[in-house]
Amino acid sequence: MTRIAGVNVPVKKCIPFGLTYIYGIGISTANIICHACGIDKSKRVSELRDKDIEKINSFIRQNYSIEGDLRKEVAMNIKSLVEMGCYRGVRHRKGLPVRGQRTHTNAKTRKGKSRLPIAGKE
């Protein structure tokens, strides 16, 4: 396992697919990183030299928020929506879909089990 941006990346994967193991980097962002660093996309992670790994690390650090910072940022954004009391915040608080999806027949996973009390049981 090669360590890039504090994440263990599998050595047998192609570089763009290996970079997607980092939270906040998808396949299109990984392709942009490879192009910006001048690294061939068809190479495997195991074929990277230390110089290439350092180049990727510095590019990611300068241009993207990833891992813990990104998770904190997303959590703070959701928290501010909930505190504002806007529609999206209310949906987050109730555990319902936020982006306008249908809930009458779908969204079973998001809604969870119904918590209605059963008559005669306490």
From Swiss-Prot:
Chain positions covered by the region annotation Disordered: 97-122
Family matches, as InterPro entries: Rbsml_uS13_C, Ribosomal_uS13, Ribosomal_uS13-like_H2TH, Ribosomal_uS13_bac-type, Ribosomal_uS13_CS
Basic residues composition bias: residue spans: 97-114
Keywords on record: Ribonucleoprotein, Ribosomal protein, RNA-binding, rRNA-binding, tRNA-binding
Cellular component GO terms, alphabetical: cytosol; small ribosomal subunit
GO biological process, one term: translation
GO molecular function, one term: tRNA binding
Pfam families in alphabetical order: Ribosomal_S13
Function: Located at the top of the head of the 30S subunit, it contacts several helices of the 16S rRNA. In the 70S ribosome it contacts the 23S rRNA (bridge B1a) and protein L5 of the 50S subunit (bridge B1b), connecting the 2 subunits; these bridges are implicated in subunit movement. Contacts the tRNAs in the A and P-sites.
Binding partners and assembly: Part of the 30S ribosomal subunit. Forms a loose heterodimer with protein S19. Forms two bridges to the 50S subunit in the 70S ribosome.
Alphabetical list of NCBIfam families matching this protein: uS13_bact
Matching PANTHER family: 30S RIBOSOMAL PROTEIN S13/40S RIBOSOMAL PROTEIN S18, SMALL RIBOSOMAL SUBUNIT PROTEIN US13M
Family statement drawn from the similarity comment of this UniProt entry: Belongs to the universal ribosomal protein uS13 family.
Name this polypeptide is given: Small ribosomal subunit protein uS13
UniProt organism field: Wolbachia sp. subsp. Brugia malayi (strain TRS)
Gene name in the database record: rpsM
